[in-house]
Amino acid sequence: MLDTIKQFLKEHEIDEKAGFIIAVSGGADSITLLHAFKYLNLRIYALHCNFNLRGKESNMDEQFVKRFCETYGIPMSVKHFDTQEYAKQKGISIEMAARELRYEWFEEMRQKKKMDYIVVGHHADDLAETLFINICRGTGIKGLTGIRPVKDRILRPLLSRSREEIIAYIEQNQLGYRTDSTNNSLDYVRNKI
């Protein structure tokens, strides 16, 4: 995993002295990213979004991320969102509301903390799901590209790795992670796949 990240930075000509905002949900992919970037001694700042959608579970995710960052000496911030109210006001889905809220905050914090990039934990399985969803929606050629590894200031260094490889890294390094119960809910398009 460390080699994957080093290769990604080299391939995309990203200076290792740059500053990286790491988006951390507490799931296996984001914990892998956070641990690997810390291990590589890169300049990082962790951000965790509490969307207040899963009651105690959301708060437990937040506490887990705080403890992880404290253990590894990683500076971090948390922001609470009223995602349901935002979705209602905008007339959009909860998924879209959470996406808009988090990326707006990530960019705001990137500038405030004088960092260069926002790093998110999308992996190969996410890429395959996105392509499938786009095909089902009758996408054009543009939609067949799926998730790009670099878009503006957003980096996705794990796109070449499967969830299985990410879990192996977690186990090898004896790292914990949280599982979002909504991943099992058929209320979200991605989960129906």
Identify the meaning behind each predicted range.
Residues 1-193:
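Core alpha/beta nucleotide-donor-binding catalytic domains of modification enzymes
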